[in-house]
Amino acid sequence: MLFSGFGSKKPFWDLDENGKRVKKGGYTFVVNRDIPNEKKTVDRLHDAKKVELRLKNTMREELKKGRGGKFKKHMKHFIETQHRFFEMPLKNAGFYGLNKPKNVHKTNKPPIGKDKNLRPSYRVVMLTIRNSNGTVESCTKFLKLLIHELSHTLANHVTWREDDHGKDFKECESFMWKILRKK
């Protein structure tokens, strides 16, 4: 495992979660402190929450209809998983997005993917919202990033692997787009 500098035992991918907490629509989001376009940033994180809820509702409907094929376990897992949305920290080790499983533990739930019975208590999803100029990214670019990061949840990726975007991930990401396009 790679570690950050200065003698820290903290892995390089374990990014800072100490931003400014802002509430909107009954949810709390975390943004960088003293940022331009804070309202737009919070709106974008709120949009992420709405997309997550839409995905979960569509998955529930698909499961009620007996659909889902090989993704039934994945969908149940995704529905049960709580996501907290954060703006990507300015010092981000080169990441554009990051899905951080928190409090990972072994369960008796059906195995899913490479991490089998491991599950997080919740996930922190960090998303780049503004480009280096401080301008909010386009909706299209943001949605692609969001679906990409949420696909790690669907695939049940809970342990760090370098470039964890293999066949299982690609299938999950494709399935997420299919679910999003329903309705």
Locations of regions flagged by a protein language model:
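Active-site-proximal or metal-binding-adjacent scaffold patches in catalytic folds
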Residues: 1-144, 153-183
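Walker B catalytic acidic pair
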Residues: 149
